[in-house]
Every structure is written in structure tokens, then in C-alpha cells.
Regions:
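Glycine-rich phosphate-binding loops of nucleotide-dependent enzymes
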Residues: 1-225
Length: 225
């Protein structure tokens, strides 16, 4: 039964950098729609695990299955197409672009027109562009940011930039969303709002979430594993 198969199955994962073992014997299984927290002190290798799961680093040993499919030998963009999206500790937005255009960067993968259509603006291009804009506003509505759609991303408050980065990751329609310290730099009310947002993401998008977080109130509030 596909629904019972884990979305992420990691076995005995490890990586060495020169003579240094950064991660060793790491095992993790995440079911569909689960929210799981990865906690530990700084330097414990949590972000390295995220880099292994997205094939930024190739593991020295062990295996990773995404929805039953191995990631070994895949490029990062191929792992993304398998259904894995992530955010980063340090916000990585196109700060000169508008909020909605940042989301459209994520949506671009699913757009169904070729280069010729986009260059000469064939009807197919406009149809896809309209769909893309509608989809972006759906995300903005969920995050209560529709009124900021045409605001320059770099001028947003810190908490809103964090939410935008999550929206851009969701735009790729992932099965598994990796959040690297999503509450970093947020005040308590922003963190409480983020907690509700992550829960809503899981429920509305039908996806699993794995997060690295130091804020234990957030971890204890939403994580099931």
C-alpha cells in the first residue's frame, strides 16, 4: 500500500570529510503527512544531514529512499523533482524581485510551455502564466501575505521573508519539505504563527515536514517524531 510506504527512508547514512566523520549511522523514517523534528547541539551535523538528503553532499555510506526511490547519484535538482524541497538557515531570496516573482521561481518547474512559447508569447505561455499567478496567490492567501504580492522581497520584515522562503519551496509541489531553523530570528508571536503555518501546510498540502529547530516550544508544539 503506497500510503503506508514512508516518504523518507534513511539507513545507516554517513559522510566523511577527509579524516573527519561528520555524520555516521544516521537512520530516519518519515511517514506521509508527518511532522518530524531533528534536534541537537550546534555542530552535531543537522544541516549536513539536510545537505545529504538533497544530494548537495554525496554520502560516503548508507542509503536514502524518497517515496521508495533511491537518490544515489542524483543531482540536487533531480532530488527536487523527486519531491524534496528545502529552506536554509540563511534566507536565500531574490531580494530585488517582488514577492510574487520569488514564488514564481519555484512554480517555474511545473509550467508547461517551451522556450519558443515564452519568447514569442504564444497563447500557451499566457495560459500557463495565468495559472502560475493564480497558484502564487493561493500560497500568498494561506500565508496571509496577498497584500504584499508586489512588494520587493528585500524590504519585507524578517518573519515575512522566512514565510516567503517557505512559500517558494512549497511552489515546487514537494512530498517532503525540509525546514532549516525556520524560527531563527523570530519573536515569540512570529514563532507561534509559524507553528500554526507549518501545521496548516501539512494539512492543506498533504506533505511531510522535517525541521531542524532550536526553539523547543515550536518543536514540542508541532512535531510528532
Amino acid at each position: 500500500d503506497k500510503d503506508k510506504k514512508p516518504i523518507l527512508d534513511v539507513r545507516e547514512l554517513g559522510i566523511d570529510f577527509g579524516g573527519l566523520t561528520a555524520v555516521d549511522g544516521f537512520n530516519l523514517m518519515i511517514g506521509r503527512n508527518e511532522i518530524t523534528g531533528l534536534i541537537g547541539p550546534n555542530g552535531a551535523g543537522k544541516t549536513t544531514v539536510f545537505n545529504l538528503l538533497t544530494n548537495v553532499y554525496q554520502p560516503t555510506r548508507g542509503s536514502i529512499l524518497i517515496d521508495g526511490m533511491p537518490t544515489a547519484g542524483k543531482k540536487t535538482y533531480q532530488v527536487n523533482r523527486m519531491g524534496v524541497a528545502r529552506t536554509f538557515q540563511n534566507i536565500r531570496l531574490f531580494k530585488e524581485m517582488s514577492v510574487i516573482d520569488n514564488i514564481k521561481v519555484g512554480l517555474h518547474e511545473s509550467m508547461k510551455y517551451d522556450l519558443a512559447s515564452s519568447l514569442i508569447r504564444l497563447p500557451n505561455y499566457w495560459k500557463e502564466e495565468k495559472h502560475c499567478t493564480e497558484r502564487a496567490f493561493e500560497l500568498l492567501d494561506i500565508f496571509h501575505m496577498a497584500d504584499m504580492a508586489y512588494t520587493q522581497a528585500g524590504s519585507l520584515p524578517y518573519g515575512a521573508q522566512r514565510r516567503l522562503e517557505i512559500m517558494r519551496a512549497l511552489a515546487t509541489s514537494p512530498k517532503l519539505l525540509l525546514l532549516d531553523e525556520p524560527a531563527a530570528g523570530m519573536n515569540p508571536s512570529e514563532t507561534a504563527e509559524l507553528t500554526e503555518t507549518i501545521r496548516r501546510i501539512r494539512d492543506e498540502f498533504n506533505i511531510a515536514v522535517l525541521l531542524i529547530e532550536h526553539d523547543m516550544s515550536l518543536v514540542m508544539g508541532i512535531c510528532e517524531g
